Amino acid sequence: MSVAAVAPVPKPESDPKAAVRENEKKWGKTLMDAGWTCIPSTIILRQQALGLDPVDMNIVLVIAAHWWKADQPAFPSKKLIADTIGKDPTTVRRRLAKLEKDGMIERILRPQPGGRHNSNEYRLSGLITGAEPYAKEEIAKRADGQAYRKARASKKGLGLVAVVKP
């Protein structure tokens, strides 16, 4: 008898290409090809607990959409953010200042010669740090739920009579 080796089927979360294919099924290839942004569910689901109102959340989403590499901050202009979310640039400036004061974002000036500035760079490290406890809470809830379901499944067999043949 021979045994054939079978390659394990990768889980979508461990195979980035599989995850992209799954997202293409949900959103369609055209939308995915036009670009996509990864946002942790915790930030979306716990935005109120994080102190983010809808305007703040939209600003965070625009910054995230322009953040392509972990070690390179995003640098959308205030005008681009304002145009994208349909708010006045003054509103965006105030909200960015509030997000910075609240520790959700870090703004870094990019000066040019002659006293002018390029658009600011933005880091979301404060938001990430602020969301971590909520993510850990969610992970613990899931683990507790799995342990509970496992315990219930093992108890289902209790109380049943097994017929034993002599």
Task: Enumerate the language-model features and the residues they cover.
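Short recognition helix of helix-turn-helix/winged-helix DNA-binding domains
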Residues: 1-84, 90-91, 115
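Alpha-helical residues within the helix-turn-helix
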Residues: 83, 100-101
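Short, cationic-aromatic polyanion-contact patches
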Residues: 77, 110-132
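Short, hydrophobic-biased segments on the C-terminal half of alpha helices
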Residues: 93-97
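The DNA-recognition helices of helix-turn-helix-type DNA-binding domains
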Residues: 66, 99, 112
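Charged low-complexity intrinsically disordered patches
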Residues: 1-32, 101, 123-166
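A short, conserved structural fragment
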Residues: 101-110
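Residue-level signal for beta-strand positions within conserved beta-sheet cores that form or flank
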Residues: 55, 101, 118-120
